[in-house]
Amino acid sequence: MRLLLIHSDYIEYEAKKKTKMAEEGAVLSDREEDALTVFTAVESVDEEDTEGVILQAIEEVKKTAGQVHAEKIVIYPYAHLSSDLARPELAVPALNALRDGLAAEGFAVKRAPFGWYKSFKISCKGHPLSELSKTIVPGEEGEVVSKKLGKKEATHDWFVMTPDGKTHDYHKYLDNTPFGCLVKKELGVAEPTGGEPAHVDLMRSKELVDYEPASDVGCMRWMPKGKLIRDLMADYVLALLLPYGATPVETPVMYDLGDKAIYEHADKFGERQYRFKSNNRDMMLRFAACFGMFSIMRDMHISKNTLPMKMYELSTYSFRHEQKGEVIGLKRLRCFTMPDMHSLCTDMPEAMKCFEEQLAIGWQTGRDFETKLVAAFRCTKKFYDENEAWVKKIVKESDCPMLIEILSERVHYWEAKIDLAAIDGQNRPIENPTVQIDVESSTRFNIKYFKDDGTPVYPPILHCSPTGSVERVICAILENISTQKVPALPTWLSPVQARVVPVAERHTAYAQEICDALNAQGIRCDLDERDESVGKKVREAGMDWVPYVIVIGDEEMASKKLTVTIRRKSEPNKPFKEQMTTDALAATIKNETAGKPFRPLYTPRKLSLKARYI
């Protein structure tokens, strides 16, 4: 922000002609005597910390007014102070906030209109402090925190609701159960924990994911085994949502902040954003798939009989400029993959019905990923008062206690939402699935359908991520595994589902036949034909968390039955072994992974050909 402060005998102006960005309802001519005139230019860089810039400007003007003993202030928008001006959508609220902030300090404040060609006359007093210029610069470049200028502050009430519909003081739940850990974190009473989360070591030691030093902090590189898990999760969500009626789309990762709807939605979100210049356009990298899907919906011809309409995108990638010190492992990233569904509903009752369906999908993903989920439901007081019976219904159907947060008024785009979270090894929540009822975006983005009489309706929109970001799901799975006596991935997500270990070279050909037969039946199976001891091969299979390990020796070749170590039935130092045929083993694994997606091996079938990545 640029300021030119003139201590004036008088300032008078008259608005002559509108520009295309002229504000309406302003005072078009005025005069003030013995005032501090503040010629002001709001710059594009001020978007990085608008609130901070305004607070600094208030202090600078207040300081100068005190030095020259001025009690009256005139704020005069003056574009000629800068060659890099902010958009009107930012500049006008910033000028109003500057005016209101100075008025709150006890000054008599006037503001000249924005976006008009004006004539003005000014008489400078001519003393040493009568002409001063100030440049106010925001914080770190590239990191934008939406300040939601002019937003209302809400009060928050908290309680716990149990499936019987009763409400309870949340203090009774401040324990170390998974739900208690969520309550403590949300209420700000969680004990501080130190050290690195368990999943960080596991993601690297198992050669799944690693940091990419040549990229920005919080951007990861995916090795073949991690890439396979990630792809299977994407397949899983698509297979889950297609039968539900979701229609897949793909949209850009960057958007023009000159679009008023996009700017307002970004500002509502309130998270750090990547913003940059493309020629003279202010752009941002998306933090979710809302922008692209809403743009598609805005251009569609929607009739009531096509609702509810569900649109899905695997947002690869989304971006949030998290603080460097907060970025860690897969839990908090700057670049991530988000399964994102938006449902356009006829009205609020239909939105609430879809909410129930999508919440059920969220709970199902927790079971399929073998992660224990706990819940926090949030809504406005108005929504709760009107729909208390429905809130009790979803708690009952979820069959678990929920932390309930009641906001005195709406400060976000949603009227109600639910967040499901896993708990990590340090008793901290990992937010994953979410469902939200958005009551603002259809109006903001001009998304509508028409009644039979031609009346337009701007309907509620549900935001749903049935899993949360893929990275956080993997984080939750690894954190859960870190607490197990015998760590094991869900078999359908295991990069290698079975491994064949020949005892000696003479057993290798038969072991190869078994390996090929299992792969032919849709089992990810590899062969450890290396010249190593059987003990070492079996130990390494355990370190790789292979669910089924088949040792082939003379007995197995003669009997045509396999000796299989089953990881999920084993205990520390007590491997569980079972004899079965090749077809029986394949049937066991297929039964265990029924209904889940399958992809073949992403690594060589022979261990002697596998490279080390970390």
Swiss-Prot record:
Zn(2+) binds at C290, H342, H463. InterPro entries: aa-tRNA-synt_IIb, aa-tRNA-synth_II, aa-tRNA-synth_II/BPL/LPL, Anticodon-bd, Anticodon-bd_dom_sf, DTD-like_sf, Thr-tRNA-ligase_IIa, Threonyl-tRNA_syn_edit_dom_arc. Its main location: cytoplasm. It catalyses: tRNA(Thr) + L-threonine + ATP = L-threonyl-tRNA(Thr) + AMP + diphosphate + H(+). One of its GO terms (biological process) is threonyl-tRNA aminoacylation. Binds 1 zinc ion per subunit. PROSITE patterns: AA_TRNA_LIGASE_II. CDD domains: ThrRS_anticodon. The keyword 4Fe-4S does not apply. Transmembrane segments: none annotated. It is found in: Cytoplasm. GO terms for cellular component: cytoplasm. Its cofactor is Zn(2+). One of its GO terms (molecular function) is zinc ion binding. Keywords: Aminoacyl-tRNA synthetase, ATP-binding, Cytoplasm, Ligase, Metal-binding, Nucleotide-binding, Protein biosynthesis, RNA-binding, tRNA-binding, Zinc. The keyword Phosphoprotein does not apply. Pfam families: HGTP_anticodon, tRNA-synt_2b, tRNA-Thr_ED. Its EC number is 6.1.1.3. Residues 1-141 are annotated as: Editing domain. Residues 198-490 are annotated as: Catalytic. The N-terminal domain is an archaea-specific tRNA-editing domain that hydrolyzes incorrectly charged L-seryl-tRNA(Thr). Catalysis of tRNA editing is performed by the charged tRNA itself. Belongs to the class-II aminoacyl-tRNA synthetase family. Catalyzes the attachment of threonine to tRNA(Thr) in a two-step reaction: L-threonine is first activated by ATP to form Thr-AMP and then transferred to the acceptor end of tRNA(Thr). Also edits incorrectly charged L-seryl-tRNA(Thr). This is Threonine--tRNA ligase.
